């Protein structure tokens, strides 16, 4: 597999642990569970009729004087629903990124695409996207309006775009942003080779886009692969991650997809997290927790939410489920480790094994790898 390196790894060695960084990192069972050597910046760019949220590395200290960025799920609602909600029903989610902070000049950094799920929005997994930026990746997440929250609630886009075509448009848009004189991310993005991860329906996007020639790895989260699908799994390195109480995408579907990927020549990996539900790889359960969660807040405010969306919007948030914050370190570590290995930042896999459990006490999980 071709290998790709960037100067940020040298920064990691200097900032984190000195000259012994590579040895210490390689020996750590869960080296990437915590934030990396960079801060995370965030900016929003336009792509036709929709927005792309972009997270990127920021040198330590360059976030001075800035407040952590927050987003509001209410901003993604159709106008008709927004008009029903009282003005004070608008819980923020505070992220680990700083808006418009100056981008580190230690790049260019590899591009990772994130695809959100059904009835969701581009910011849905900032717990992960900001983390990846701290480890030296530029992460771009577009609004897949065709399956987004506003569309599901009655305000679809016109025209509608096919998901993989839209994903390619994001790559092209990021390449232009990299070349635009004076742009915040000028010279900071490498788009020659990319990776993609996605949640639920976005995991399906990652599978379909994974066959593109410039993709080095695809990482479906809480997603499966129908046995009767007309799409063939790409013979590319893959990481499949889900929870064993997922009531939306039955875990067996993810396991079957991993087993199908295991018949190919490229490495396939599976992480199955005990007691994690469908929304574990997202911010959603953590939004408005004090009010019973975002769905309960909406119901209390009188929003007419279909029962199917109530189930989708609460799976993994129930009291018996693993608290989502306890699952995040495991998700962060394995996704980061897979990306660093696939892009060649780590010449050998770091923490892609059962041994990672030694550094991830918050959650219990099983790990498989093939071949």
Model-found features: residue ranges?
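C-terminal motif of bacterial Sec signal peptides marking the signal peptidase cleavage site
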Residues: 17-20
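Domain-level recognition of soluble alpha/beta enzyme cores
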Residues: 24-112, 289, 300-324
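Active-site machinery of serine-nucleophile hydrolases
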Residues: 57-59, 70-81, 123-151, 157, ...
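Short substrate-entry loop that stabilizes the transition state in hydrolases
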Residues: 92-109, 114-151, 247-251
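Alpha/beta-hydrolase active-site loop
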Residues: 124, 156-191, 208-210
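A conserved short beta-strand
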Residues: 142, 214-225, 269
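Gly/Ala-rich beta-loop-alpha elbow adjacent to hydrolase catalytic centers
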Residues: 198-202, 206
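Active-site-adjacent alpha-helix of alpha/beta-hydrolase-fold enzymes
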Residues: 233-326
